[in-house]
């Protein structure tokens, strides 16, 4: 009887622990897949069109050609709802899909508000893109633990200065 109880304990305890720990996971994969490819060929391009300093940000939306000064090409893609390109407080580049994961609509996109949080205009969810990797800090997204979709930002594999990709 004690061996049976020990075996059950060894099976049940890890399952319960795994179930409880999964509750704290931020779901940042709610949006459908969409191509992302924003290329900055040189450091000068990055400084001119990208984000240059700590807590800086720029919106990239292919359909609206936003920002207008960026050299758009046929190979430029900006995800599901556009790309919010920013830097954290240490100047490290970050990128997120602008579509609110609560609304899941390419037409409902977050914008940086006066408190430096990304805010959804419809559900008023708030996301910290500068310190919490797009994690939710208010509104329905915080209640459901829905974060912004995170994109990769790094040096290109063909010599580009910086590339934003999925």
Regions found by a protein language model. Give the residues of each.
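Short metal-binding segments enriched for Cys and/or His
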Residues: 127-139
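C-terminal motif of bacterial Sec signal peptides marking the signal peptidase cleavage site
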Residues: 18-22
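Bacterial N-terminal signal peptides that target proteins for export
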Residues: 1-11
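Conserved SAM/SAH cofactor-binding pocket of Class I
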Residues: 144-147
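Secretory/periplasmic and organellar redox-cofactor proteins
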Residues: 5-7, 23-27
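Cysteine-rich micro-motifs
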Residues: 116-125
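N-terminal pre-ligand scaffold of iron-sulfur
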Residues: 26-112, 128-131, 149-166
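Processing junctions and N-termini across compartments
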Residues: 17, 94, 114-117
């Amino acid at each position: 009887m004690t061996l049976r109880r020990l075996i059950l304990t060894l099976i049940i305890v890890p399952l319960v622990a795994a179930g409880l720990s999964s509750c704290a996971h931020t779901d940042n994969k709610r949006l459908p897949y969409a191509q992302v490819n924003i290329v900055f060929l040189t450091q000068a391009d990055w400084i001119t069109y990208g984000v240059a300093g700590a807590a800086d940000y720029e919106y990239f939306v292919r359909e609206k050609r936003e920002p207008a000064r960026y050299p758009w090409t046929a190979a430029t893609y900006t995800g599901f709802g556009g790309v919010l390109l920013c830097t954290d407080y240490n100047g490290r580049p970050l990128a997120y899909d602008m579509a609110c994961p609560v609304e899941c609509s390419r037409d409902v996109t977050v914008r940086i508000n006066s408190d430096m949080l990304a805010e959804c205009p419809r559900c008023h969810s708030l996301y910290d893109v500068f310190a919490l990797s797009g994690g939710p800090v208010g509104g329905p997204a915080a209640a459901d633990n829905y974060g912004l979709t995170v994109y990769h930002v790094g040096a290109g594999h063909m010599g580009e200065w910086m590339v934003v990709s999925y």
